[in-house]
Curated annotation (Swiss-Prot):
Pfam families: DAHP_synth_1
SUPFAM superfamilies: Aldolase
Enzyme class: transferase
UniProt keywords, alphabetically: Cytoplasm, Lipopolysaccharide biosynthesis, Transferase
Pathway: Carbohydrate biosynthesis; 3-deoxy-D-manno-octulosonate biosynthesis; 3-deoxy-D-manno-octulosonate from D-ribulose 5-phosphate: step 2/3; Bacterial outer membrane biogenesis; lipopolysaccharide biosynthesis
Family listed: Belongs to the KdsA family.
A molecular function (GO) term: 3-deoxy-8-phosphooctulonate synthase activity
Protein name in UniProt: 2-dehydro-3-deoxyphosphooctonate aldolase
GO terms, biological process: keto-3-deoxy-D-manno-octulosonic acid biosynthetic process
Domain of life: Bacteria
Taxonomic lineage from the root: Bacteria, Bacillati, Cyanobacteriota, Cyanophyceae, Synechococcales
HAMAP family named among the record's database cross-references: KDO8P_synth
NCBIfam families: KDO8P_synth, PRK05198.1
Amino acid sequence: MGQSTLIRAKVGDRFSIGDGCPLTLFGGPCVIEGEDFSLKMAESIAKVCDRLGVQFVFKSSFDKANRTSIGSFRGYGLEEGLRILERVKTELGLPVLTDIHESQQAATVAEVVDILQIPAFLCRQTDLLLAAAATGRTVNVKKAQFLAPWDMKNVVNKLRQGGAENLLLTERGSCFGYNALVVDFRSLPLMRELGCPVVFDATHSVQIPGGAGDRSSGQREFVPVLARAAAAVGIDALFMEIHENPDQALSDGPNMIRLADLEATLRHILRVREAVAEPIGASA
């Protein structure tokens, strides 16, 4: 990647993420928990981001297809979930992001959302990647917990061959034995060398997969620590799942941050990012 080439991804016609752009937050509850709650959370997070000059994309899932237990809450489903996301988008004027799990979902979801997200477990699924690319929407791919950062070049190549122009790559931790994740921060500059802005998923990186037996656990107290470390290394966007009361959340509560803690967390991250203020790269 030539030094004169700007690394950016567009979020529709709203703003860009990458070189020379403000920090972007992908944030919201893990799963859609209702219409009023989604609107309330989106509006509250947006106000924090506006105060801090952070670009904001609302994130929430219509279906959690890979829950640990068959009895766990999965979501409102495709039709109702998209209707709620569309309300967030139109009534609050916010870009929205959600994940897809099957190739046939891509075109339908792309009619509503600004960013299609590919879950980490599915990031090598060629048909899913090509379907997402064919929509013309920006695509955010989470690096699988079992993949090396340099292996993401094959994922990027699939998407580009499929016609995708605006790509983002997300680090969300790597397997560290059983029921544990660890973050190798080298992955951020290494993935950015593929020509894509990079995102750090601070909340899933503290997840303890299957740590509570029939569900995953997590250590939300380490979210700010890892997020500041990522900001020091260099990131274009930050992914954090946020809830008014994480202990009552219907999915991933142990690793979501409290809405009340969001502003202070972002302020610390912005200070670190400003202090570093140099290009991201493995050779920097």
